[in-house]
């Protein structure tokens, strides 16, 4: 019996007991579908994060500190980093504190969900690119000025989501309440994502000392301070990072009390984390494929027992052991293949 005949008999066997065949395939269908969904979601998330890092540019440097260290009685503050920018203009072009908070937003009589609030200085907005250090651009209005930050003015720049949701696109000059404190909208950021709640468009920027008074911590849990710096170019980012690390070590006397990362390093770390997570999730999903394969094996063993009469007749007609074994192998392979196709399609 050739392969074509065996394949036709396998399809006939599947058609004869459709429900049994479907239940046998179910493990393969679920397993293949789960692997495809997980890979698709993982790749989508990775691409989304990579696009966000690309918007930031390759010259961004992130600094986080975790305490006073062992060599001094004070932390490094923004004034210390300003000195570095002034001292090494060939490597560094700007620095800003980056304070993360969240606030309940209220406009007139309407309340909105808690929104991410970031405290920054005027240096967060770069005049040469007309955008922020993280790649956002202004749609209208202006960004925070030195006067706004120095005088702790209650002004804010909001994302597209809040501008559309609360103000129907007419936000400039309007006053909103952030956790009970009134702020005047002076700028609106361009849409950068899907403009939904919790997205990159659902943000508010205010002077950093105002955000510190909200008392809700910094960008990363456990950090005392966080700063963003920009190197003059991608080529000088590593050298600029070294300058910053040297200054921090001088104060803390230990690298355990701070962390400095370039945007390229952040992207690499994120990709490594995502790849590890993907491997774990795919391995978990692959277990269902293994279970499906074991299910097909069990059904084939039961089928051999049920079809002893058919096997005997074939042997009496001259079928060899390898022909009968090949028939069951082809049936198992056909069942797996059909289940795999259904898993891909559905």
PLM region spans:
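Hydrophobic, regular-secondary-structure patches
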Residues: 42-116, 123-126, 146-147, 164, ...
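Hydrophobic secondary-structure segments that place a key small or acidic residue at a functional site
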Residues: 98-99, 110-215, 239
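Alpha-helical membrane-interface segments at transmembrane helix boundaries
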Residues: 11, 15, 42, 46, ...
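ABC-family P-loop ATPase nucleotide-binding domain
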Residues: 1-3
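Mechanotransmission and gating elements of multispan inner-membrane complexes involved in transport
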Residues: 74, 86-91, 168-170, 177-184, ...
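Transmembrane alpha-helical interface segments in multi-pass membrane proteins
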Residues: 6-11, 15, 19-30, 34-42, ...
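Generic structural signal for small/hydrophobic residues in well-ordered secondary structure
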Residues: 17, 45, 63, 84, ...
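Short aromatic/hydrophobic contact patches that present stacked aromatics
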Residues: 29, 38, 62, 155, ...
């Amino acid at each position: 019996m050739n392969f074509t005949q065996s394949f036709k008999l396998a399809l006939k066997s599947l058609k004869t007991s459709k429900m049994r065949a479907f239940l046998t395939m179910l493990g393969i269908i679920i397993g293949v579908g789960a692997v495809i969904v997980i890979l698709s979601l993982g790749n989508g998330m990775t691409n989304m994060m990579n696009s966000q890092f690309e918007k930031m540019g390759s010259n961004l440097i992130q600094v986080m500190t975790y305490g006073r260290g062992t060599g001094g009685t004070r932390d490094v503050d923004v004034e210390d980093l300003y000195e570095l920018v002034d001292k090494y203009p060939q490597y560094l072009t700007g620095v800003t504190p980056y304070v993360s908070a969240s606030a309940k937003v209220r406009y007139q009589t309407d309340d909105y969900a808690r929104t991410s609030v970031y405290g920054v200085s005027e240096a967060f907005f770069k005049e040469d690119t007309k955008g922020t250090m993280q790649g956002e651009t202004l749609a209208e209005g202006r960004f925070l000025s030195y006067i706004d930050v120095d005088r702790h003015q209650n002004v804010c720049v909001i994302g597209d989501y809040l501008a559309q949701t609360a103000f129907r696109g007419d936000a400039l000059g309007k006053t909103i309440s952030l956790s009970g404190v009134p702020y005047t909208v002076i700028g609106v950021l361009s849409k950068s994502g899907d403009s939904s709640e919790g997205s990159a468009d659902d943000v508010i920027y205010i002077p950093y000392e105002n955000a510190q008074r909200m008392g809700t911590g910094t960008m990363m849990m456990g950090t005392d301070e966080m700063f963003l710096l920009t190197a003059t170019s991608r080529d000088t980012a590593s050298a600029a990072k070294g300058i910053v690390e040297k200054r921090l070590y001088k104060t803390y006397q230990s690298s355990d009390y701070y962390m400095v990362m370039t945007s390229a390093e952040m992207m690499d770390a994120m990709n490594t984390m995502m790849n590890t997570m993907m491997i774990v999730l795919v391995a978990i999903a692959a277990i269902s494929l293994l279970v499906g394969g074991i299910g097909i094996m069990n059904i084939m063993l039961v089928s051999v027992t049920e079809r002893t009469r058919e096997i005997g007749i074939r042997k009496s007609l001259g079928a060899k052991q390898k022909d009968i074994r090949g028939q069951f192998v082809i049936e198992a392979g056909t069942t797996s293949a059909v289940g795999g196709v259904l898993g891909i399609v559905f």
